[in-house]
Curated annotation (Swiss-Prot):
Name assigned to this protein: Iron-sulfur cluster assembly protein IscU
Disulfide feature: none
Co-factor requirement: [4Fe-4S] cluster
Pathway: Cofactor biosynthesis; iron-sulfur cluster biosynthesis
One Pfam short name: NifU_N
Function recorded in the entry: Participates in iron-sulfur cluster formation (ISC) pathway for iron-sulfur (Fe-S) cluster biogenesis. Plays a role of a major scaffold protein for [Fe-S] assembly; assembles [4Fe-4S] clusters directly upon interaction with the catalytic component IscS-Isd11 as part of the scaffold complex. Can transfer [4Fe-4S] clusters to target apo-proteins.
PANTHER family named in the record: IRON-SULFUR CLUSTER ASSEMBLY ENZYME NIFU HOMOLOG
GO biological process: intracellular iron ion homeostasis; iron-sulfur cluster assembly
Family named by the database record: Belongs to the NifU family.
Cited Gene3D superfamilies: 3.90.1010.10
One MF annotation (Gene Ontology) recorded for this entry: iron ion binding
Length: 162
């Protein structure tokens, strides 16, 4: 069973454990599944206190909405942008997935607020991954966030043109 548990394992490094039975009263310093991943402080911060969680009314003309996902890992991100005069005034997200997907989504919403549409389209997954110090096996989460930005802008532009 997956769960969010902060623990101090392996030489005192702080990590996010993916399994509830990793820790128990008898053996708090051993992960039975050895599937603990070390995350940066930025990932832990955005995972534990995600910014801009929620949604807007997708029927509003100035709201661009995207839903992107990766079937192989089960991550799904819904991103919505509130755009006025080609400037992203606000952003909201909802995510179902791992800590890296949540952190990537949360950071992406902070990164794009106040940017023009053209500036937001220049954001690459590397901007997100490098800030969060994502490990190589979690880079796909930053790719999802980049795709979500692009698709939300595309949706907004389609709505404005109709």
């Amino acid at each position: 069973m997956k769960s969010k548990i902060l623990c101090n394992l392996f030489k005192g490094k702080s990590c996010i454990c993916l399994y509830t039975n990793c820790l128990n009263e008898n053996n708090v310093n051993k992960c039975y599944y050895n599937l603990v991943r070390n995350y940066s402080d930025h990932v832990k911060d955005h995972f534990n206190k995600p910014r801009n969680v929620g949604s807007f009314d997708k029927n509003e003309k100035n709201i661009g909405t995207s839903i992107v996902g990766k079937a192989s890992c089960g991550d799904v991100i819904k991103l919505q942008l509130k755009i006025e005069n080609d400037v992203i005034k606000d952003a909201r997200f909802m995510a179902f997935g791992c800590g890296s997907a949540i952190a990537s989504s949360s950071y992406a919403t902070e990164l794009i607020k106040g940017k023009t549409i053209d500036e937001a389209l220049k954001i690459k997954n590397n901007d997100i991954a490098s800030h969060l110090s994502l490990p190589p096996v979690k880079i796909h989460c930053s790719l999802l966030a980049e795709d979500a930005i692009k698709h939300a802008i595309k949706n907004y532009r389609e709505k404005v043109l109709t």
